[in-house]
Amino acid sequence: MDSTSETRSGSWLSVIALALAAFIFNTTEFVPVGLLSDIGHSFEMPTSQVGLMLTIYAWVVSLASLPMMLLTRNIERRKLLVGVFLLFIASHVLSGLAWSFQVLMLSRIGIAFAHAVFWAITASLAVRVAPPGQQAKALGLLATGTTLAMVLGIPLGRVVGEALGWRTTFMAIAGLSVLTLLYLARSLPLLPSQNSGSLRSLPMLFRRPALVCLYVLTVVVISAQFTAYSYIEPFAKQVAQMSGEATTLLLLLFGGAGIFGSILFSRYSEAFPRGFLLAAILALGSSLALLLPLSAQPTWLMALSLLWGMSIMCFGLAQQSRVLRLASDATDVAMALFSGLYNVGIGAGALLGSVVSERMGLASIGNVGAALALAGLLLALFAALRYAEALKTTSL
């Protein structure tokens, strides 16, 4: 094998390692979605209150992303990822041993700090280690790891939780994380900090109106998504009257659809940059609006989950790609902000979903989410017209 082939092969192995890590982190962030009822039963709490663990987790990530990125900006990236995983593993062990909801929340906060650093640097690292000219495919592979968390991680976490208890799910994640850590340490090259930026980068980034608009759009649309998705498990069981097995299948279909979303992104986002994003938001809003009307027909609800899963994946990838392009001179700061604001949306959506569930009923989570998605669509239309030149391409 020549040196060029070795370099390219090594680069792809590094991207695969990061995709595997993305699978782990996204699995643990959202696996409580499939375990809300079981966790609530263990601590004698309603699911609307247990769901707030999603809000607290997400908001810790949002608050910690930028400070943690700045504190670690001079640390070699492979060493930093190893440290992140050690905290991640220890916190999962505590989750599995949690003797109260407060201890469970403490462990989740530890995981959230690890998450904050991981997602602030991972997308830019995937682009750095990818073979020349393959940056978009590297992001697509990273997205595949994220998607597989939805396809396999969350449903399997639910299956394990139902069979062996939710604590076993967290312990299993800790075990898989150990294997992933060993793979990361072996496959990643030395990665000195590069284009990480500093606090001086913030005024520069906020003077880019197209970028600021993307950030606001992310918060609005992700809030819409998680108003409904955070409580899809109790919605499926209580409103749609689906069995536990059917609910697991619903989560499986939602996650699996994300694979097709990443394929659509790879093929069409650069050819139709404005239309692609608008179509993704429109499809998301339509999915949320149809959640209640189709709940009486489980088959149609499962079909709807395919459109829903594809649309949110397309939206997330399109936003991430644009942020990286619009802030190529301060990628780590820009992605820390993106990760933080994405989690502001997750937390806001989970909180809003909790309020809606308690005051209006679980049946209303889709309609409220759809209203937010409509606001996001209008904002995206404004951005497409106002910042057409800056947003005309998503290429890296």
UniProtKB/Swiss-Prot annotation:
Pfam families: MFS_1. PANTHER family: PURINE EFFLUX PUMP PBUE, SUGAR EFFLUX TRANSPORTER. The gene is sotB. It comes from Pseudomonas aeruginosa (strain UCBPP-PA14). PROSITE patterns: MFS. It is a multi-pass membrane protein. This is Probable sugar efflux transporter. The chain crosses the membrane at residues 15-35, 50-70, 81-101, 103-123, 136-156, 170-190, 209-229, 246-266, 276-296, 298-318, 333-353, 365-385. GO terms for molecular function: carbohydrate transmembrane transporter activity.
